[in-house]
């Protein structure tokens, strides 16, 4: 079980999240020794003070639709790092993918990576909205742009990670880019299959329920 837990970004990104929810999430994360907590940007500073370095903090920018301008995303990223984030999950502009404006996407990723330096960047491509050719192209763009991870989903779209997507990403992404599966991890079996297929990070808000074999309907 430890090999699964060390890949987990223990996540809470729902609109109604309270500070009490964040504290519970952080305590659970410490107890389970997961990879990180993934939380809203507005809670990063308080969570950093609360955790005192016990667990890495991940947050999101351009979330969940990716429509923010590059300048806005860069500001969000810098602000998150200044407040104590160790990792940043950014959403690309899906419209840019549909418009085949890949140069703009690559430039944006590079600017955000430059802004956060040696902190970890994960690029969310929202696979549920993409066809196979678009997914392959985004693997290439993310690889060339210097991101640390490519991530399947926000968990807010029409679908989450699939085993087929992870296998496709593993085939086409560069060897220096890791894969994060998110929004589709509903059981221990799911987690094991995603890891076996090539995912090195799992984003889920359901890990506690998964460990108890309870129903999982959340992100």
Swiss-Prot record:
Q: Which CDD domains match?
A: DeoC
Q: Does the keyword Zinc-finger apply?
A: no
Q: Name one Pfam family in it.
A: DeoC
The catalytic activity of this protein is classed by the Enzyme Commission as 4.1.2.4
Q: Which domain of life is it from?
A: Bacteria
Membrane spanning residue stretches:
none
Which SMART domains does the entry mention?
DeoC (SM01133)
Q: Which GO terms describe its molecular function?
A: deoxyribose-phosphate aldolase activity
The UniProt entry's sequence similarity note says:
Belongs to the DeoC/FbaB aldolase family. DeoC type 1 subfamily.
Which NCBIfam families does the UniProt entry name for this protein? Answer: deoC
Q: What does this protein do?
A: Catalyzes a reversible aldol reaction between acetaldehyde and D-glyceraldehyde 3-phosphate to generate 2-deoxy-D-ribose 5-phosphate.
**Name by which UniProt lists this protein:** Deoxyribose-phosphate aldolase
Q: What is the organism field in this record? A: Clostridioides difficile (strain 630)
**In the UniProt record, what gene is named as encoding this protein?**
deoC
């Amino acid at each position: 079980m430890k090999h699964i837990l060390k890949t987990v970004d223990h996540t809470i990104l729902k609109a109604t999240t309270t500070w009490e929810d964040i504290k519970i999430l952080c305590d659970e994360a410490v107890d389970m020794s997961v990879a990180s907590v993934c939380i809203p940007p507005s809670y990063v500073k308080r969570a950093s003070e609360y955790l005192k370095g016990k667990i890495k903090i991940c947050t999101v920018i351009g979330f969940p639709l990716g429509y923010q301008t590059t300048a806005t995303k860069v500001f969000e990223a810098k602000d998150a790092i200044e407040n104590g984030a160790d990792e940043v999950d950014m959403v690309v502009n899906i419209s840019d993918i549909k418009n085949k404006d890949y140069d703009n996407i690559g430039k944006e990723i590079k600017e955000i990576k430059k802004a956060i330096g040696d902190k970890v960047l994960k690029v969310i491509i929202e696979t549920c909205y993409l066809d196979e050719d678009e997914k392959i192209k985004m693997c290439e763009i993310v690889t060339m742009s210097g991101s640390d991870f490519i991530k399947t989903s926000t968990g807010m779209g029409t679908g989450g990670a699939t085993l087929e997507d992870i296998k496709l990403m593993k085939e086409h992404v560069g060897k220096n880019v890791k894969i994060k599966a998110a929004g589709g991890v509903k059981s221990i079996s799911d987690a094991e299959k995603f890891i076996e297929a090539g995912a090195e990070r799992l984003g889920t808000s359901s890990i506690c329920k998964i460990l108890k074999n309870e129903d999982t309907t959340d992100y």
